Amino acid sequence: MAETYLLDKLASVEQTYQELTRMLADPDIATNPDELQRVAKARSSLEETVDTYETWKRSQEDLKGARQIVKESGNDPEMREMAQLEVEELENAIGELEKRLTILLLPKDPNDEKNIMLEIRAGTGGDEASIWAGDLVRMYTRYAESQGWKVSLLSESLADMGGFKEAILEVKGDRVYSQLKFEAGVHRVQRVPVTEAGGRVHTSTATVAIMPEVDDVEVKIDPKDIEMSTARSGGAGGQNVNKVETAVDLFHKPTGIRIFCTEERSQLQNRERAMQILRAKLYDMMLQEQNDAISSNRRSQVGTGSRSEKIRTYNYKDNRVTDHRLGRNFDLNTALEGEIHTIIESCISQDQQERLAELAEATNN
């Protein structure tokens, strides 16, 4: 990693980190909770890079010392052998540190820290597609819970035979978008449906959208573009059931997006939820346009996030999940129980390798 531009970037990151550390000790910042949180978060985001860089610098000094010992131990073969062994170990360690540093210096996705709206829609396959959408809701809920994230159902359209025509979950926690963004796309299942008397294998699909949460500052919505009506909702029981119009049906005229919210107790809360979902959908549309422009210039396997991209097949007969972007198979039963961390980490790793290759190509040109 002798590239000057990388070393310059690391020195700049370290300088920024030190400045942020000084700011945390500033009494004016210490008495301003919002600013204190902002500075602490910015410093924390650089901590791993700086720690790894410090380890790299120490290892370089140790390597220099070990090489000097090799040079000076001419008449002491035992000392020379020990020093040579240390040189080899340090060179290997430095190589791994340099790989890690290069990944840490890759441009950050500004949405990685955000919470998400996770939308699952039944695709082709009729009733079986809705049942499959329900299975995916369960899979992602279990995975989120295993990560210590909070999951809430924001909107649902139940299917007659079970499952969902559509479901929208809110997932809150540490770096949720960074972990789940590569789950967007078409998920295909091959199995014998419970509704199939003849035992034939059917193929059905469901589409997953991963939408980072945004506030009203990031996405402006003109009130004139909104049509809103209310309806009676099942509510939470008691006198409220079917008597008060708490459900909200929101229609965004420019895009044709319609959102029906019933999960909250009051009409105001459901309206706020519907607007929250609409903002996420509009922001996601903007991201899709950006990604389409980027992916036309990029040989990306995992990073497109296209709604029409078939990313995975779940084959019940062979107890196998195939991720088509990775060209790898995984165990079906564990995946359906929410144990998809290995698949997710593999997607993240492949995306990093692709971006590193692009960086190397750009540097050489």
Curated annotation (Swiss-Prot):
GO molecular function terms attached to this record: translation release factor activity, codon specific
Keyword Protease recorded: no
Main subcellular location: cytoplasm
Record's GO cellular component terms: cytoplasm
Keyword terms of this UniProt record: Cytoplasm, Methylation, Protein biosynthesis
Keyword Protein biosynthesis part of the UniProt annotation: yes
Modified residues (N5-methylglutamine): 239
Modifications made to the protein after synthesis: Methylated by PrmC. Methylation increases the termination efficiency of RF1.
Compartments, as annotated in UniProt: Cytoplasm
Family: Belongs to the prokaryotic/mitochondrial release factor family.
Function: Peptide chain release factor 1 directs the termination of translation in response to the peptide chain termination codons UAG and UAA.
Protein name, UniProt field: Peptide chain release factor 1
Lineage: Bacteria, Bacillati, Cyanobacteriota, Cyanophyceae, Synechococcales
Gene behind this protein: prfA
